[in-house]
Amino acid sequence: MVDATSPPGVNAVVNYYVPNSDGSPPATNDMAVMLGQKDMISHKMRIRDLRPYKEEYSLDRNGFQYATIHSTLTDATDETQIKEVYYREIEKLVQDITGAKRVLAFHHAVRTRTGNEFGEQIKDRYQGVEGPAYRVHIDQTPQGALSIVQFMFPDLADDVRNGSFQVINVWRPLTRVQRDPLMVADAAEMPPEDLLLISRKYYNGLHSSNFVIKYDGRMAAGEGPTDGLSGDGKHSWWYIGDQEPTEALVFSSSGFRNGKAIIGTAHDLYSAEPMINAYERKNASSLYGHDESQI
């Protein structure tokens, strides 16, 4: 799609999951795996700036999309304002991008470098201040996305089970991103054999699952603008350079379309040398489910 030698970008370390030697899946609710504290290996990859090529990548085709948003939210710590103002703005943004007949906001998180207590995230039912993750992952499997939407919206359980829906993440910074940018992988090129399921069980009884990502390739970026080749595909990473609060990175977290699974987009944060001494990064991210079959 894009000449691999042309896009601006950076070389950065990307953290992947190291599978169990016996081929067994990660243990259910393995917090150390989820937080990137064990079974991890790092590869240097090329991360390309999406902004000059934003018209060439779409949510439907690649699993992510550049978008602009001019939010009227004035206080990212005010839960009422977030739900009454920001949710409506993001619902409209997602509806404009997808053409969905119905969009429902059901989660938000304000992330900083200081908060990293996964247990607190679970205790407060998906709300709160959360630290950044440092391992490549996909938030839900298609079945995990179905479980979450049915749990959050029980009156829609039959509709989503028999129709089409997708969980979508909208990632927007509160200030210009100066360190730990979000990167996303081109879903059209990601080899499915590199996705490994991990089961999750929440305190409230919800059962879900997400993907951790392995990398089997030997062609990491090194010092050149090269995608990481792995299996029959490649890991092609993108970010928005110096992302502003008026810019959003919209990406899929899995779902179903007419009974066919939609695999979400692998993503993570990364650090590059010029960013190490930059200021703290603040970000607001939200998840949205939309039922394309809803009238």
Swiss-Prot record:
It is an enzyme of class 1 (oxidoreductase). Its EC number is 1.-.-.-. GO terms for biological process: terpenoid biosynthetic process. Keywords: Oxidoreductase. Pathway: Secondary metabolite biosynthesis; terpenoid biosynthesis. InterPro entries: AsaB-like. The keyword Oxidoreductase applies. One of its GO terms (molecular function) is oxidoreductase activity. Induction: Expression is positively regulated by the cluster-specific transcription factor pbcR. PANTHER family: BLL6449 PROTEIN, OXIDOREDUCTASE AN1597. Belongs to the asaB hydroxylase/desaturase family. Oxidoreductase; part of the gene cluster that mediates the biosynthesis of the diterpene ent-pimara-8(14),15-diene (PD). Within the cluster, the HMG-CoA reductase AN1593 functions in the mevalonate pathway, which produces isoprenoid precursors. The geranylgeranyl pyrophosphate (GGPP) synthase AN1592 is needed in the formation of GGPP, the precursor for diterpenes. Lastly, the pimaradiene synthase pbcA performs the 2 cyclization steps that convert GGPP to ent-pimara-8(14),15-diene. The putative roles of the remaining cluster enzymes in ent-pimara-8(14),15-diene biosynthesis is unclear. This is Oxidoreductase AN1597.
